[in-house]
């Protein structure tokens, strides 16, 4: 499958993604809050093999129980998390404070992907290990083309 076709199935232009993704509590869309823990900053790799599609998302520090992976109508894979990363300062000495804090994570992660026709919606599996969420979707076997008889109109 070409890169253009994969982009058609998996990638949404930012303008469309902005419409689909929910608005944050502050009223900003996820695209507008870029750089402040936006879910658009979550690195994602999508691998297509001959037998399956594999999604890799880096979301360190979130509890596995706070991550939801669902398949919605219209062949849409949805990955959500409302979890908050636990900071090391919960256990630090009283009077300690961060002087630099760059490792922020989306507070409300929502990622949606339109899946291709050959994705087997019943075979979706997910695992979360060492801060990486891996979602695997098997491919359906190719369907042989069905011949279609066309009626010829007589005029």
Swiss-Prot record:
PROSITE patterns: SHSP. Its main location: cytoplasm. It holds the Pfam family HSP20. GO terms for cellular component: cytoplasm. Gene3D superfamilies: 2.60.40.790. Keywords: Cytoplasm, Stress response. It comes from the Eukaryota. One of its GO terms (biological process) is cellular response to hypoxia. InterPro entries: A-crystallin/Hsp20_dom (IPR002068), HSP20-like_chaperone (IPR008978), Small_HSP (IPR031107). It is found in: Cytoplasm. Residues 35-155 form the sHSP domain. May form oligomeric structures. Belongs to the small heat shock protein (HSP20) family. PANTHER family: HEAT-SHOCK PROTEIN 20 FAMILY MEMBER. This is 17.4 kDa class III heat shock protein. It comes from Arabidopsis thaliana. The lineage of its organism: Eukaryota, Viridiplantae, Streptophyta, Embryophyta, Tracheophyta.
């Amino acid at each position: 499958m070409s890169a253009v076709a994969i982009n058609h199935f998996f990638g949404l232009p930012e303008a469309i993604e902005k419409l689909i993704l929910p608005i944050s509590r502050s009223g900003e869309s996820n695209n507008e809050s870029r750089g402040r823990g936006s879910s658009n900053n979550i690195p994602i790799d999508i691998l297509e093999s001959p037998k399956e599609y594999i999604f890799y998302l880096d979301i360190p520090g979130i509890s596995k129980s706070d991550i939801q992976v669902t398949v919605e109508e219209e062949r849409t894979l949805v990955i959500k998390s409302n979890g908050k990363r636990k900071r090391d300062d919960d256990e630090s000495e009283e009077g300690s404070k961060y002087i630099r804090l760059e490792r922020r994570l989306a507070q409300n992660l929502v990622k949606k992907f339109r899946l291709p026709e050959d994705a087997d919606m019943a075979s979706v599996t997910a695992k979360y290990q060492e801060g990486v969420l891996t979602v695997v979707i098997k491919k359906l076997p190719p369907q042989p083309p069905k011949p279609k008889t066309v009626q010829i109109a007589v005029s």
